[in-house]
Amino acid sequence: STVQTINREEHLKQFSKDYFDYIIIDETHRAGAKTYQRILDHFSPKFILGMTATPERTDGYDIFSLFNHNIAYEIRLQKAMKEDLLCPFHYFGVTDIKVNGEVLESASDFNHLVSEERINKIDEKIKFYGTDDNTLRGLIFCSKVDECKAISEALNKIGYKTRALSGDDSEEERANAINDIESDDPNKKIDYIITVNIFNEGIDIPRLNQVIMVRPTQSAIIFVQQLGRGLRKAERKEYLTVIDFIGNYQNNYLIPIALYGDTSYNKDTIRKLMASGSSLIPGSSTINFDKISKARIFESIDSSNLKLKKDLVQDYQLLKFKTGRIPSMVDFLDYGSRDPSLYVEYSKSYYNFVADQEEEYESKLNPSQSKLLEFFSMHINDGMRVEESIILERLIQQGFISYDDVKAIIRKNYGYEANDKTILSAVNGLNLKFVTEREGGNGKTLSINEKYGLRIVSESENKITIDSMLKDALTSTIFTKFLKDNTEYALKTFGNKFSADKFQDGFILYQKYSRKDVFRILNWEQNPNPQTVGGYFRSKDESNIAIFINYHKEEDISASTDYKDSFIDNTTFTWMTKSNRTLEAPEVRVIREYNGLRIPLFIKKSNAEGKDFYYMGEMEPITNSFRQKNMSSGDPVVQIDFNLNKPVEESLYNYITHDN
């Protein structure tokens, strides 16, 4: 019996509430509809089971509550592929046609979407990429019903057998089309079903061996649904071919999110996934992009705002439904949901965001407590350095911790030796003496500690204790709850990215750091003014010079700052000092002497990536490489070559050095 049939009043009356011991709901994400609700309200079974590939509804209905938030088993696309439950796929992201020199956009004119040029390109790619057995059994997904019909007519004219289907077609017509695409009878068989979204779910076409997408990706969930139509295993089916025509679409960043299954919406993570190619895809499946389509996706990642309030609220609500409670920052990590740091970036603290969503938390903290949570969230518990969070966790638990205990915890959990200088720097950070703010209108820069007169922790004789302001704040159970969660989030975040073989005295190779992060990890007493840092800055004690590189500079950059900084190869880097420097300049002298000097290298591909830089490793100057040069402006500059202490990993090296 179908849902539509049993939903009728005359049919429901035939069954008592306890007639069924077990009820199984397939495609249970639809259970929020009135038809399903009427059935579920009528029956009281001993056991109810829901099955769906996409439980994350975006209409605000809590599907999980129907099952008391009890998730018996969950398997996502990547895990199903790893377990060999699906057939492999080969994905090809190809550039859509250009109209008047411009790649198609979401709002492109209908005539361009069905132009002869576009039909010819679809035909070309069908023949080029083909299928596993050279027999076409494909689905083509379009963005509009009239586009489906026009593309179907055009492909039929050049020799294909296709059928356009929409919501107006009956179940019988859809079933006939499925039978025909699976048929071996040459008189019945069709090559393609062309549709918008009616085949996103609930259909079974095991022999389907090609999926073509000629529409922008509006949702990672829908992308996976459409991809999944062809992943069913079948006898003699070797793989699925996926051809995705990528235009200049705003949401192109959703493609790697869908393909790789990462829903953190962390831009750096998405870039790394794109750079990884097929290496992170289970089994024999592959992912390929042509040069232009790959550039379009990177541009979309750079330009998209991944912390819009509507998106943050949506993912917050989905996780709340899933867990059956207000989610914590750690829940976002444990469930593989949106990166909780995005909530901090948006609201200054996760508490602020929750208080905006939940009446029970509104105005529960006084301004001092709320401000302190903001400071910890933005400047301490960010997962960039672990020492502060270890100290804070123990202070919350017992009010004190010794230097030796900090060292023992780090030795046990991470296998490296912390030193007194770093622990003292962490205490300085916890007291918010490192981070600065401007005071009033005079522009004077003060540490946050000095500006607000904070007393957070005390340090004496290698013992750290809780001070008055933090002690008072911890009398609030809500403050304590959110600070504990924030601290646990920081410890987990650091632990998730920590790798002993990539850890180099505070930094983790190929992780991203802001300038503020860098100077904090280098144990500077106070964060320097960014305007004075520029491309590098040396410490007062001349123990380190951190170098920051914007690898692909803007075309309109001034001649006096157009520095020729670049990789010679993956182990050698050539670098220029600031202009108006000679071989006798102080920083050149310090680098030439290289007496215990630390020179960490930080690079971002371009300014479009934002303010953070990849840590590329430690550098050592090549003795005979110091040379006096002149900028194109005529200003003197010194160029120096360096050896990196480790070769840069291939995927990141290629990503940074290749211009989009």
For each feature predicted by the language model, list its residue ranges:
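Long, largely alpha-helical accessory region at the distal end of helicase-like NTP-driven motors
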Residues: 127, 144, 258-391, 398-402, ...
